[in-house]
Amino acid sequence: MKRPCGHIKNANENTKPNTPEGCEECLKTGDEWVHLRLCLECGHVGCCDNSKNKHATKHFHATEHPVIKSFEPGESWKWCYVDEVFGQ
């Protein structure tokens, strides 16, 4: 049986977004995104893997911050890059 993901369990639910208006990098370059993801470690807002720039995943590779949360209205799921699991 697989152990529960400790990263999601210990993620900070109260992390505030650095750029609530959109993807931090895309806003600087004028690019568009499909969906947004919030890093629960530092508040970075990045675009999803369906977006051409995939800034949320690039942020994980650069920082090793393990957990993102959907930054879409009405969605509350989380993803752990380390354990590759979804959580609530």
Q: Predicted regions span which residues?
A:
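Canonical RING-type zinc finger of E3 ubiquitin-protein ligases
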Residues: D31-L40
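Cys/His-rich, Zn2+-coordinating zinc-finger modules
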Residues: R3-G22, T29, V45-Q88
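Short cysteine-rich clusters marking metal-coordination/redox-active sites
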Residues: C23-C26, C39
